[in-house]
A protein has these predicted regions:
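A structural boundary/capping signal
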Residues: 2-202
Length: 202
């Protein structure tokens, strides 16, 4: 089974005996990026598909998985190291973005199908290279985050893709090759997840 290695840690006990306290490798949920269902410009559905895949192949790990929406009131969030970015730093200003997190213990892996970073990437490296710091940004570009458990996201998320259509009904970007994701309660609730108002819970 593929896994992600973690640096070894050697600790000396009071007895003077050196004990190896190496953490066990983290299960690599997706062996390679190309194995994942991916449609450019539909990050919310890409992540939903990752959650669905885990619920089928590694159902016991779903409790350790989370979905993170990134946005703000002005819908302008700068992210670096994005495949759609231009020039050397690969900067993109999205209206929103979405990530998949896996936290089996005190370690955390980020799966971002739109990033040029390794797949997956440890959280600290991902945050450092993708978000950098708000100190260099104007307030309208500050990033806010909504974190949802993968199981709840699977159960409640719905999108009829209306946000990807122009007023004449044509597509801004080609849609995925499968039917829209629906829930029993709502045909479309994407805006509820993107909304960063802390008083409104998805």
């Amino acid at each position: 089974m593929a896994s992600v290695s973690h640096p070894s840690k050697i600790q000396r006990q009071d007895t003077g005996v050196v004990t190896n306290t190496t953490k066990k490798p983290i299960l690599n949920l997706f062996s390679q990026r190309s194995d994942c269902k991916y449609t450019p410009a539909y990050c919310e559905e890409n992540v939903w598909k990752l959650c669905q895949d885990i619920s089928t192949r590694h159902s016991g790990e779903l409790q350790h998985c989370y979905v993170v929406f990134v946005s703000n009131d002005s819908r302008t969030v700068p992210l670096w190291r994005q495949k759609a970015g231009k020039e050397e730093e690969k900067l993109v200003i999205w209206d929103y973005h979405e990530l998949f997190l896996y936290t089996p213990d005190d370690r955390c892996l980020v799966y971002d199908l739109d990033s040029e970073l390794p797949y997956p990437t440890y959280l600290h490296k991902y945050v450092t290279e993708t978000f950098r710091t708000d100190h260099i940004l104007k307030p309208e570009y500050f990033r806010y985050f909504r974190v949802i458990s993968a199981s709840l996201f699977l159960q409640h998320f719905a999108s009829d893709r209306r946000h990807m259509k122009r007023s004449d009904g044509s597509w801004i970007k080609p849609p995925p090759d499968y039917p829209p994701i629906t829930s029993a309660a709502n045909p479309h609730n994407l805006d509820d997840f993107i909304n960063m108002d802390p008083t409104k819970v998805s």
